[in-house]
């Protein structure tokens, strides 16, 4: 009957999805073993001067045939199989080496390097300890590094998290809240933790020219951050019209395909 058929199809779909996730996990493990997980860098620009201000580090998987995949496509697999730490370590190690190379480049202007971390990884503390150790080894000033905390992650023990981040801030590291405005956690984090930067969710930014609602949201999120003394970064800037709107609102920094695609070296 129809119900049995639907149930069979549903189970079949779940089995297929589970097998696909398992295949992705093996692909990712192999990529890590073969050192084919690499950082790409997307430039973040100063809205006032138009000059590069920072680089966001993005994980990419290089397939054996040379095809490049975004690690974002594997996010469910990474979380399910606990591969976040290995991925973060691989990316941080290479990104910090690239930062050291950039610092050694004659005439290179000052810059900041943004690194994405999940709240779970930060709470595990091993990753931040590793980053701190690498900074010391490579003689990278801690204020070059900005750790981005993803808004969608829930933090279990906020008191411990606050103390831990406070200790790192005292050492000079900086923090950004990613995807601001996309959920309840945004405002909870803003109340409980101290951030140097807020990245306004690109889902709002990309529609500000056409949508009065999104334009109003971005303007008011920007104003909120200004009153709190937090610098703003707009994601998903896909046209000059969007950039003009953001400048008019007083957004500090911007990134997106209109300004620059992610590339394998800091431009």
List each model region and its residues.
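EAL-family c-di-GMP phosphodiesterase catalytic domain
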Residues: 9, 13-16, 47-51, 61-64, ...
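Structural preference for long, well-ordered alpha-helical segments in enzyme cores
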Residues: 77-78, 91-99, 130-131, 164, ...
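Catalytic core of bacterial c-di-GMP phosphodiesterases, primarily the EAL and HD-GYP domains
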Residues: 49-53, 83-160, 236
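A short, well-structured catalytic beta-strand-centered motif of the EAL phosphodiesterase domain
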Residues: 40-76, 95
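Short, small-residue-biased leader/transition segments that mark boundaries at the very start
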Residues: 2-4
């Amino acid at each position: 009957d129809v119900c049995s058929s639907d149930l069979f199809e549903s189970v079949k779909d779940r089995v297929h999805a589970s097998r696909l996730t398992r295949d992705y996990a093996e692909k990712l493990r192999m990529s890590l073993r073969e050192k084919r997980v690499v950082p790409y860098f997307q430039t973040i620009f100063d809205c006032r001067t138009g000059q590069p201000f920072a680089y966001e580090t993005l994980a990419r998987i290089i397939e054996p045939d040379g095809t490049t995949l975004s690690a974002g496509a594997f996010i469910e697999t990474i979380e399910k199989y606990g591969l976040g730490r290995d991925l973060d370590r691989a990316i941080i190690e290479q990104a910090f080496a690239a930062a050291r190379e950039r610092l050694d480049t004659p005439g290179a202007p000052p810059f900041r390097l943004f690194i994405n971390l999940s709240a779970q990884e930060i709470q595990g503390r091993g990753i931040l300890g590793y980053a701190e150790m690498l900074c010391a080894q490579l003689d990278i000033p801690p204020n070059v590094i900005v750790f981005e905390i993803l808004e969608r992650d829930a933090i279990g023990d906020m008191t411990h998290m606050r103390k831990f981040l406070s200790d790192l801030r005292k050492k000079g590291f900086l923090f950004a809240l990613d995807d601001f405005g996309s959920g309840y956690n945004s405002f909870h984090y803003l109340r409980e933790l101290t951030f140097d930067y807020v990245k306004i969710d690109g889902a709002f930014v990309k529609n500000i020219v056409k949508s009065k609602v999104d334009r109003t949201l971005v303007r008011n999120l920007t104003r909120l951050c200004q009153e709190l003394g937090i610098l703003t970064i707009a994601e998903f800037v896909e046209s000059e019209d969007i950039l003009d709107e953001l400048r008019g609102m007083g957004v500090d920094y911007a990134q997106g395909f209109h300004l620059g695609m992610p590339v394998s070296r800091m431009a």
